[in-house]
Structure formats: structure tokens, C-alpha cells
Amino acid sequence: EPFMTDTSPAKAASAEKAAEANADAATPSKSYRRYVLVVLTLVYSLNFIDRQILVILQESIKVDMDLSDSQLGLLTGFAFAIFYVTAGIPIARWADRGNRRNIVSLSLFIWSFMTALSGLAQNYSQLLAARIGVGIGEAGGSPPSHSMISDYFPAEQRGTALSFYSTGIYIGILIGFAAGGWIAETFGWRVAFFLVGVPGIFYALLLVWVVKEP
């Protein structure tokens, strides 16, 4: 007899069930997806805390370093924005091909380290360089985070997940203005940079251990 492949309905059904079981095993649980979403939202909050802190501290820095309005404007606006924009595109392309969790972690480490380093600046040029570093680091936060959230959540839940992630903006602004002003008034602007930047450095290292690349 010629060789015949067994294509019986029972075997086909068994294969389909096995495939579904493998797919379910590979799909993260609902609780883990929510957990990752909270972790990435906290990263986004740190992004905006570090971004807003200079706005809060600018008057103290202006007096301490004897800066002109044009120097202050460059420090708080253009220097950050131009590097944030130009670095964002290549980092997003990198995220399409690389490990997105590691990119988020590295970006968080860079901008947090540069924020803390701002507290050591002895002149305008050093502070400007540190803020440029913050801009480059923060450019790598959102693109890979959006991509990870899109992979973790099915299409029907993605809009809600991304909306939750966006609350990190307002959480960061709220904490930045509330805590930053008090710290600056109590301890000075240099300490404020340290206290805002250092937690992000440790959080960046922790992120590698607590989040899986989807």
C-alpha cells in the first residue's frame, strides 16, 4: 500500500489543542501585563520629573551662576529639545530591532545620571552639557515603551493601556513641581538634582530584573 498520512479529525483536533496550549503558555498573564504597565508608567513619570525639575530650579540657578535670560532659555528649552528630537528617531529604529527593555533601562540610567550630574555643575557649560545628556536619554524612553505595551496587550485593550501609560506625564509633573520646589527651598538646587536623579539610576538597574522582553 502507498504511504498515507493520518489526517483524521481526531488527530487534527489534538494538534490544534496542543497549539492553543503552547500559545497560552507563551502569553503573559493579565496580572503580569498590568504589572509591566505600572512599571513602565513609573519610568514615564521619572521622565517628566527630570524634565520639569529645571523649570522649578531655574531662578535659583540663574542667580547662583549669574546667567542671562538667553542662556537660561537655551538651557531650559532648545538644548534639551533639539537633542531629544534628533536622538528619538534613531533610538526608535534601534528599538525595532533590539531588546526594548534594555533600551528603556539604558535610557533611564542615562537621563537620571545626567540629572544627578547637573547638581555637580560648576559653570554654565557643564550644566548645558548635562541637560543635553538628559535630552538624549529621555528620547529613548517612550518609543520602546509604547512598542512593548503594544506587544503585551491585545488590540482591544491597547488603547486603555496606552492611556494609563500617559498618566505618567501628569504624575511626573505633579511630583516634580510639588517635591522639587520644596527640596530646592529647603536644601538648594544642587541637592534637588541629586534627589531627583539618583532614584532613577537604581530603578534603571532594577528594571532589567523585573520586566521581560515580550
List each language-model region with its residue ranges:
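Cytosolic juxtamembrane N-terminal segment immediately preceding the first transmembrane helix
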Residues: 5-49
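Residue-level signature of mid-helix packing/kink "hotspots" within the transmembrane helices
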Residues: 52, 80-89, 139, 173-174
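Extracellular/periplasmic helix-loop-helix junction of adjacent transmembrane segments
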Residues: 55-86
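Membrane-interface helix termini in secondary transporters
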Residues: 60, 89-93, 182
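Helix-breaking motifs and short loop linkers at transmembrane-helix boundaries and internal kinks
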Residues: 66, 99, 120-126, 137, ...
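Conserved MFS/SLC helix-loop-helix module at the cytosolic interface between two early adjacent transmembrane helices
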Residues: 86-125
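Cytoplasmic helix-loop-helix junction between adjacent transmembrane helices
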Residues: 130-170
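Helix-loop-helix hairpin linking two adjacent transmembrane segments in secondary transporters
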Residues: 165, 169-213
